């Protein structure tokens, strides 16, 4: 199926492979992990908090469906869902967002998935710029976005906390897929509470 994007068309659904991951549309087998991703307090700490009970019930009961720009991150070796990634136009601009379950953070999966998805976007979409928004206190995410070539466009307040709106050109080169973006200066991954 071909879908119309803000600036053109792209085939959908699409599966994107990286060395360790498959970025794919969600399926019914992902429901439990998706609910956990939406309700886990560690995962949601910088994402506006865990969803409420009514939203959780709606997710449990609704068909997952295939929506343009929304994928799950699954391990290539066994298809275990470890997180999600989106590239959509909810704010009127192409926006990247990602979340991992706590036990999968700090292992390079966020960087790997972002590089793979941004590489796909540069080939398939006509957009020139992609944005990302991160809480200023989410130092790991801000550090990753900077390493991916994002720069701060502006600060803003959202969900009662300070955020950064970052942007990068889709036409600029991406870091090598094999390169590790993790450095000793990076904050440690979150721990289970």
For each predicted feature, which ranges?
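Glycine-rich acyl-CoA binding loop
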Residues: 109-111
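GNAT-family acyltransferases
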Residues: 1-103, 115-120, 124-135, 148-193
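Conserved active-site tyrosine of GNAT-family acetyltransferases
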Residues: 145
């Amino acid at each position: 199926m071909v879908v119309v994007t803000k600036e053109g068309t792209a085939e959908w659904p699409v599966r994107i492979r990286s060395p360790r991951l498959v970025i794919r549309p969600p399926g019914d087998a992902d429901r439990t992990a998706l609910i956990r991703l939406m309700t886990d307090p560690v995962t949601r700490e910088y994402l506006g908090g865990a969803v409420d009970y009514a939203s959780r019930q709606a997710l449990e009961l609704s068909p997952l469906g295939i929506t343009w720009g929304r994928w799950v991150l699954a391990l290539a070796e066994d298809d275990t869902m470890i997180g999600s990634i989106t590239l959509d136009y909810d704010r009127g601009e192409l926006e990247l967002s990602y979340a991992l379950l706590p036990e999968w953070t700090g292992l390079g999966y966020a960087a790997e998935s972002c590089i793979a998805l941004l590489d796909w976007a540069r080939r398939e979409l006509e957009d020139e710029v992609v944005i990302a928004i991160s809480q200023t206190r989410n130092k790991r995410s801000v550090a990753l976005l900077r390493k991916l070539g994002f720069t701060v466009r502006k600060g803003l307040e959202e969900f009662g906390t300070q955020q950064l709106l970052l942007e990068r050109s889709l036409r600029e080169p991406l870091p090598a897929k094999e390169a590790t973006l993790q450095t000793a200066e990076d904050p440690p991954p979150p721990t289970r509470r």
